[in-house]
């Protein structure tokens, strides 16, 4: 293989000159590497999808996902496969940092600002992190939409609509990453990709044993690391008391884009 590559390089040098031949050789090598990497990501995605289906099927039976051995084993298998996929797709990192580009409605000034979030450690919450990155980053396109449409007393809730995006297969949760103030959780159960920012400590409201469940919790998948002042301003979004759903779409706080920072 090496002899063949060397012969090809020498032939190219004769035709284009050493510098041009080297550049072409490097480009072909990079293209081959990119194709191989894409193939690896696709293979890992298939592995995640298979395991996700298994976990979702178990979840539908109504068993305790934190107490049933079959469920625990299936979840561990899904989490391991998801970590491998995340590292191949988004880069090796303990967690990922993203910038949410916020646009306030005209009723709040119409200006823009940024809220920066850091995901939960991949070691703890790979499935939840994957669901968010898939919807917020991978599936962005012309019909992608995200906006905060609920201002309740304890959360700011946003819809996240991306073609093909799905929610959680189960409520992944780890007590080491609880629903403290300025964390992000998935709305609904299993929940997602719609999410909320906790504006108060919501461990009791959304943690284990909440909302009628003896053991389960909302998934908590990220925290605000910059822009707490922006979040505080968002709490002034016009909304009726009670459930806090914004009646006038013109008063939505729009997330115009989400940018994933390169892993450090």
What is the predicted function of each stretch?
Residues 16-264:
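Cyclophilin-like peptidyl-prolyl cis-trans isomerases
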Residues 2-17:
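Cleavable N-terminal signal peptides of Sec/SRP-targeted secreted and luminal proteins
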């Amino acid at each position: 293989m090496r002899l063949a590559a060397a012969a090809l390089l020498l032939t190219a040098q004769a035709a284009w000159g050493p510098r041009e031949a080297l550049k072409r050789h490097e480009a072909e090598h990079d293209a081959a590497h990119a194709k191989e990497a894409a193939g690896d990501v696709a293979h890992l995605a298939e592995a995640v999808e298979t395991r996700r289906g298994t976990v979702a099927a178990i979840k539908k039976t109504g068993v305790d996902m934190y107490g049933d051995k079959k469920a625990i084993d299936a979840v561990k298998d899904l989490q391991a496969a998801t970590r491998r996929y995340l590292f191949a797709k988004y880069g090796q990192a303990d967690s990922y940092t993203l910038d949410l580009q916020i646009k306030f409605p005209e009723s709040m000034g119409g200006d823009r600002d940024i809220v920066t979030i850091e995901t939960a450690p991949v070691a703890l919450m790979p499935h939840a992190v994957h669901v968010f990155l898939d919807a917020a980053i991978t599936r962005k396109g012309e019909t992608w939409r995200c906006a905060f449409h609920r201002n309740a007393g304890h959360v700011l809730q946003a819809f996240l609509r991306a073609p093909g995006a799905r929610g959680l297969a189960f409520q992944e949760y780890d007590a080491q990453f609880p629903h403290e103030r300025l964390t992000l959780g998935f709305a609904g159960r299993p929940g997602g990709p719609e999410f909320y920012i906790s504006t108060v400590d919501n461990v009791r409201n959304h943690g284990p044993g909440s909302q009628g469940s003896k053991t389960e919790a909302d998934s908590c998948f990220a925290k605000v690391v910059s822009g707490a002042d922006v979040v505080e301003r968002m709490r002034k979004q016009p909304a009726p008391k009670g459930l806090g759903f914004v009646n006038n779409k013109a008063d939505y706080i729009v997330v115009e884009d989400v940018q994933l920072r390169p892993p450090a």
